[in-house]
Amino acid sequence: MVEAEEGGQRHSAKLVELAELQPGASVLDVGGGYGEPSLTAARTIGPEGRVVCTDISPEMLAVARERAADAGLINVEFVARDAEELEFDDESFDAVLSRATLMFLPDVAGTLKRLHGFLRFEGRLAATVWGPQPVVQFSAAFPVIAQELALPPPPPGRPGAFALSDPDRLAELAAQAGFRDVETGTVSVIFETESPEQYTEFIRDVAPQLTTLLGDQPTAMQERVWQKVTDAYGQFQGADGRVHTENQAIWFKGRK
């Protein structure tokens, strides 16, 4: 649901700001999904620049490609590939961006080292991950599904939405990968939909792993669980009926 995803524009704008993108730059987006921050970066660097938007999901990239075409952006390429399997020549990019992706990777340290290699001298990395679960309101669906399926708590260190919610750990990983002048901070990401039902649709779109968890369950149970998820998002519903969630993301940046 792109309409709700557009609520993360502040998220994308922050990444572009941190990367200090200039007209004509070459940019790699790792985990670009429905097209952000790629499209924001493409507008910033202009037609002489180049953005390579990568994601593991061809379906999401198909939407991103349509959005780029609708916006008249001709400087974006799309590559469907796992973030840990990207292959580019060394020193191919002026900047690497990644929005809410790295925490899902089994080998974050190795991936950061490879991204460092893709950058030209003085090139910049700018990335975000989600903060701790209590300050990420869209995660209200997670404990509901875990309770209904009697899922055990994930073991420490396992990839997941909140696996990199420690800023100090992020800074350490970036420095170990070779990045200099590493800094971290936070940005508030707002997601809004017209109703709790629409918010559940949004979550199912952007977090397909939740649908996968329920995939083997009887249809009646799936419907019951999704209704409970919708009920959970009702706590964020305003008097106008709209659902408004505030979600803290942690950003970090560094240069080669």
Give the ranges of each region predicted by the language model.
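Conserved Class I S-adenosyl-L-methionine
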Residues: E5-Q9, Y34-E36, R158-K256
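Conserved alpha-helix/loop element of class I SAM-dependent methyltransferases that forms part
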Residues: E6-A25, T40
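Conserved hydrophobic residues forming the short capping helix/wall of the S-adenosyl-L-methionine
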Residues: I45, A68, I145-A146, A174, ...
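A short SAM/SAH-binding and catalytic strip from SAM-dependent methyltransferases
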Residues: D94-A109, G131
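Conserved class I S-adenosyl-L-methionine
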Residues: R124-L151
